[in-house]
Amino acid sequence: SKEKVELEKIDALYEQYNSTKDEVQRKAIYKKIDSVSGVAAKYAIANEYDKMMSAMGAQGTNAFTSFEQTVYTDDIPSASLDKYLAVQAERFRNPVLRIFHTELEAVYEEKNRTLDNDGRKVSETLFSNLFQKHNYGLQTTIGTVEHLKNPSLIEIRKYFNKYYVPNNMGIILSGDFNPDEVIAKVDKAFSYMQPKPFDKYTFQPEDAITAPIVKEIIGPDAENLTIGYRLPGNKDKDALLADLVGQILTNGRAGLLDLNLVKKQKLLRASAFTYSLIDYGILYLSAAPTSGQSLEDVKALVLNEIENLKKGNFDDQLIT
């Protein structure tokens, strides 16, 4: 098709862009990408997917990527399920990356926001220190500025062909439908997909943490403290215990941090939760001082509640 010719030109231009170091030349190539994208756009319907979803009454169309998953979501009327499955089956058959460069600009904006976000900087620092051998800490989901500056549509397609296979994907549906009928429809719509081998992620076990790792983040937000404990992965029985620990420490009403620190106004805020992933997890504690307190004061108060937890100094109803 005429569009395919232009899209292939864009692929080639991105490869040229990636291999070019001179900034003046890179700007000239990117200008060509913009120009060819404009030509390619004449052969397609703008916002085609959103329009199709809206036409069938869909809401909440979105997608996100986290450590171990990329998820595509829609909320659709049950009467539109057949149409929806037909669209999704074609969508994942051979993705056409029509507006890649404009979407990339949106990701750039998101990345720039994270560079000035204290909470994000704290989280990334915590992960990078707890996980010095695992990708949880060796890289971020959004990537580096250099990654975003040098995209490759060819590599993206290689990734898609390698990992978007039925033995590495799941279709999750909930709502008003007959599950037996819907499973048969899903099987039929996606029957063209064939399982393929793919490389599962491997890693070296993390070394034991034998002493506290202390890092300081400088930023515009008010002072606050974050403490992280590395946990086993979500298939380990201790992961369930860790989740229970998080609930005992804080549940918004009667956890140790809630009762002893927040309600007694010893701290401005304090919370704990478990971040559970496949290979490892984190018990994540966060607290903010009241007026006149130092972060050392905050740490002492939080760690004291950890000691109360160890000693069983809490209401039994928290675990019944």
Protein language model regions, located:
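M16 family metallopeptidases and their MPP-like homologs
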Residues: S1-E90, K121-E146, N168-S174, E223-G233, ...
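Active/ligand-binding-proximal structured segments within catalytic/core domains
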Residues: S1-K2, I227, K237-L249, L257-L259
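Short, charged, amphipathic alpha-helices and their helix-cap/turn boundaries
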Residues: L148-S152
